[in-house]
């Protein structure tokens, strides 16, 4: 794998706010694959679980599709984009209804191999 080539994995429509996910992503950006998994495993945030799955998936993609060593992988890019919002209604007094927006996000992880 040359320095320009990268391996990517995306988790789409994850049912958590992109703002909450970005707080966790900032802690693992630029770290090695193994270090990122260790950090994610012990974080007290709900966003850690779906991010852990995507990081694990991108390493599996690198090993199976490009025959790379997982120990040499470094997270070069990681970001969360906003997905569609699920719209729900909360009944209120006197026949009114309030709108509830339940956010989703798309988590993208790109890794590169260091030599």
UniProtKB/Swiss-Prot annotation:
Its main location: plastid. One of its GO terms (biological process) is translation. The keyword Metal-binding does not apply. CDD domains: Ribosomal_L22 (cd00336). One of its GO terms (cellular component) is large ribosomal subunit. InterPro entries: Ribosomal_uL22, Ribosomal_uL22_bac/chlpt-type, Ribosomal_uL22_bac/org-type, Ribosomal_uL22_CS, Ribosomal_uL22_sf. It is found in: Plastid, Chloroplast. It comes from the Eukaryota. Keywords: Chloroplast, Plastid, Ribonucleoprotein, Ribosomal protein, RNA-binding, rRNA-binding. GO terms for molecular function: rRNA binding; structural constituent of ribosome. Belongs to the universal ribosomal protein uL22 family. This protein binds specifically to 23S rRNA. Part of the 50S ribosomal subunit. HAMAP family: Ribosomal_uL22_B. This is Large ribosomal subunit protein uL22c. It comes from Thalassiosira pseudonana (Marine diatom).
């Amino acid at each position: 794998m040359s320095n320009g080539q990268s391996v990517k994995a995306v988790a789409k429509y994850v049912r958590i706010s992109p703002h909450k996910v970005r707080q966790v992503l900032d802690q693992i950006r630029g770290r090695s694959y193994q270090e990122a998994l260790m950090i994610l495993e012990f974080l007290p945030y709900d966003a850690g679980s779906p991010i852990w799955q995507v990081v694990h998936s991108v390493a599996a993609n690198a090993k199976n599709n490009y025959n790379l060593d997982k120990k040499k992988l470094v997270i070069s890019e990681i970001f969360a984009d906003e997905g569609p919002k699920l719209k729900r209604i909360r009944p209120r007094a006197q026949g009114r209804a309030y709108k509830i927006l339940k956010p989703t996000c798309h988590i993208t992880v790109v890794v590169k191999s260091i030599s």
